[in-house]
């Protein structure tokens, strides 16, 4: 066997996709059943991730801080019974939620560098926080649950600053 008989085949990276969802569980999301709507939307988004064999993670923020509730993993048994205990109330520590998500995305980037990482932020934007866009988020989507007569437009402001997509829940459900 000689050197010309050896062949090197470069394989395309198979990093997959991670969808990191950040759910606003603050008191303002309880009004108008926004949190219930957000939970229903999350169930649908997790079902899509599961069907696509994509990984998902869920960070919830409200009250005094944020915590990782699921993942990152391929959601297999995601259903309403798992999400029902996620309650709401208190302040809107958006920066804490984004910081927690940034840690999830950073760990994912180290573990699977070729993975495409999506950050979804489901909030009404009723926070004075102006967090910076997480460095390891390849794509960012804001889902704006603000429905007040006088809108603050903070989701739009952050989406514009981050170069992110902005949707209402109705646009994603339709």
Per-segment meaning from a language model:
Residues 1-20, 28-34, 51-52:
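Acidic, polar low-complexity linker/tail segments
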Residues 18-20, 116-120:
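Structural motif
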Residues 23, 60-62, 121-123, 144-146:
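Short beta-strand/turn micro-motifs composed of small residues
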Residues 25-36, 126-130:
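Short acidic, Gly/Ser-rich segments with clustered Asp/Glu that frequently serve as metal-coordination loops
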Residues 36-52, 57-58:
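An active-site-proximal "capping" alpha-helix that borders the catalytic cofactor pocket
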Residues 55-85, 130-133:
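Short beta-strand-loop
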Residues 66, 76-117, 126, 144-153:
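Von Willebrand factor
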Residues 125-170:
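VWA/integrin I-like adhesion module and closely mimicked acidic/polar interface patches used
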């Amino acid at each position: 066997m000689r050197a010309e008989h050896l062949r090197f085949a470069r394989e395309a990276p198979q990093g997959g996709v991670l969808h990191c969802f950040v759910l606003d569980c603050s008191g303002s999301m309880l009004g108008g059943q926004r949190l219930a709507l957000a939970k229903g939307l999350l169930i649908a988004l997790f079902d899509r991730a599961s069907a696509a064999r994509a990984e998902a993670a869920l960070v919830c923020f409200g009250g005094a801080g944020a915590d990782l509730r699921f993942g990152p993993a391929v959601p297999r048994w995601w259903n309403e019974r798992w999400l029902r205990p996620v309650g709401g109330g208190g302040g809107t520590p958006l920066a804490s939620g984004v910081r927690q998500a940034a840690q999830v995305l950073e760990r994912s980037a180290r573990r699977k560098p070729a993975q495409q990482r999506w950050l979804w932020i489901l909030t009404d934007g009723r926070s004075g926080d102006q967090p910076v866009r997480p460095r390891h988020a390849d794509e960012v989507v804001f889902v704006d649950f603000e429905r007040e007569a006088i809108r603050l437009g903070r989701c739009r402001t952050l989406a514009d600053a981050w170069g992110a997509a902005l949707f209402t829940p109705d646009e994603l459900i339709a």
